[in-house]
Amino acid sequence: MTPRVSDPFTGQSIESARRTLAARLRSAQLEEAELDARILLGAALGLDLTGLIAQAARLLTEAEASRIAQHAQRRIAGEPVARILGTREFWGLPFRLSDATLVPRPDTETVVERALELFREQKATQQPRIADIGTGSGAILLALLHDIPGAFGVGTDLSLNALETARGNAVTLGLADRSAFVACSYLAALRGPFDLIVSNPPYIPSAEIPKLSLEVREHDPHLALDGGNDGYDAYRALIPQAAERLAPGGALIVEAGQGQARNIETLLTAAALVVDRPPKADLAGIPRAVSARKMPP
């Protein structure tokens, strides 16, 4: 049961409420208490940072104080800020979330970076076809469509809720006419050929999920986390299907968990794909975006 948090914000100014909220979050041992407080306060009041500063002395209304208290209660209970707001920025673009989607993380931007790197290096077709497997909110696919004019993309997911969320994000970003979303397992409903296939598949070993942070294990969908006994179930299913549906010269890019990149490269090679460069690392130096090509006959 979510613990109740009293409302200490009624009658406070915006600046006083910010300090109170930050103190409460610090007391709950939340690492980014100051940043979380500013974001949650701004969301509750409909103000950006400039607005919070400009109106710092204004007293809160009763409704505003109630909203701030609700945000505080949810954050102290371990709910991520992005879940509370229902949105997260990825690749500089806003994405709505749902219970069926992961919160897009900066680590996954390495997949987008590697894809754009490959497109710059080769003479891609004027209308490249992209598939995003396990699309969730559509973050990877829609980021690529945003940056690759003329590309058309298909996102697949088992969750109808996730697909609805992805379609909504495509509409918001003005990319609905260049994207489609299909309910299926991996690439089962797709024929290809595709110039690029991308995926952030579930890769957490089943036994490790209870050890994840509260924010992840209680608020991210387990379908998008659980990679089976050793964490490689999704890769074993995805890679052979992707190899069959890649166009000659096309590339497959997948996100890897910590310590998984080398084993994934072995699976790629076993599917007759060519690993022609090292994985792209995230900001912590962990190899994340693992890629391979289907060589022309």
UniProtKB/Swiss-Prot annotation:
Gene3D superfamilies reported in the protein's UniProt record: DNA helicase RuvA subunit, C-terminal domain, Vaccinia Virus protein VP39
GO BP annotations listed: methylation; translational termination
Record-listed substrate binding positions: N200, P201, P202, Y203
Transmembrane regions: none
Keyword Oxidoreductase tagged: no
EC numbers on record: 2.1.1.297
Binding site for S-adenosyl-L-methionine: G134, T135, G136, S137, G138, D157, N200
Family named by the database record: Belongs to the protein N5-glutamine methyltransferase family. PrmC subfamily.
HAMAP family, alphabetized: RF_methyltr_PrmC
Record protein name field: Release factor glutamine methyltransferase
